[in-house]
Swiss-Prot record:
One of its GO terms (molecular function) is DNA-binding transcription factor binding. GO terms for cellular component: cytoplasm; nucleus. Transcriptional activator. Shown to have a role in the negative regulation of exit from L1 arrest and dauer diapause dependent on IIS signaling (insulin and insulin-like growth factor (IGF) signaling). Hypodermal expression is regulated by IIS/daf-16 while neuronal expression is not under the control of IIS/daf-16. Residues 41-93 form the bHLH domain. Expressed in hermaphrodite dopaminergic neurons (ADE, CEP, and PDE). SUPFAM superfamilies: HLH, helix-loop-helix DNA-binding domain. This is Helix-loop-helix protein 13. It comes from Caenorhabditis elegans. It comes from the Eukaryota. Signal peptide: none annotated. The lineage of its organism: Eukaryota, Metazoa, Ecdysozoa, Nematoda, Chromadorea.
Length: 147
């Protein structure tokens, strides 16, 4: 197939709509030696799929934000902040489950190590998570506040 061959619903590529912006519409065929213009229906279907995909990703981020500690004044965390906080929070919860120590004492020890710059503090204790943990109303949860 050449640039003048059919590829746009039977039309020659040179007569495809938006010929001036073909770089956005061209895709290589399986032989990688010729180009064709994508059908409008296929493009529309692909756009719908992409919108659905982005919508499901956004819904997943909204759900994830419900499970990580946030500041009361924050409207919404960015996606990267959400992921970083989720990773730190999961690591903290994993450490709490694995330690033979009392959970509250273990967290207080880790927080103290991080605040005093001691080597050996868990990676999650140096993250933004510590600042957020200070906003939690621990007494309402029946837990002594983290010092």
């Amino acid at each position: 197939m050449t640039a003048s061959s059919s590829g746009c619903g039977g039309l020659p590529v040179s007569q495809c709509p938006s010929y001036s912006s073909l770089s956005k519409l061209f895709f290589m065929d399986s032989s990688y030696d010729s180009y064709y213009c994508e059908e409008p229906e296929e493009r529309q279907t692909a756009s719908i799929r992409e919108r659905k995909r982005m919508c499901s990703i956004n819904v997943a981020f909204i759900e994830l934000r419900n499970y990580i500690p946030t500041f009361p004044y924050e409207k919404r965390l960015s996606k990267i902040d959400t992921l970083n906080l989720a990773i730190a929070y999961i690591n903290m919860l994993d450490d709490v489950l694995r330690t033979p120590e009392d959970s509250g004492q273990y967290i207080q020890k880790c927080v103290h190590m991080a605040r005093t710059g001691q080597i050996g503090a868990p990676a999650w204790s140096t993250s933004d998570l510590l600042a957020r943990l200070n906003w939690i109303k621990w007494r309402r949860l029946g837990i002594e506040p983290i010092a």
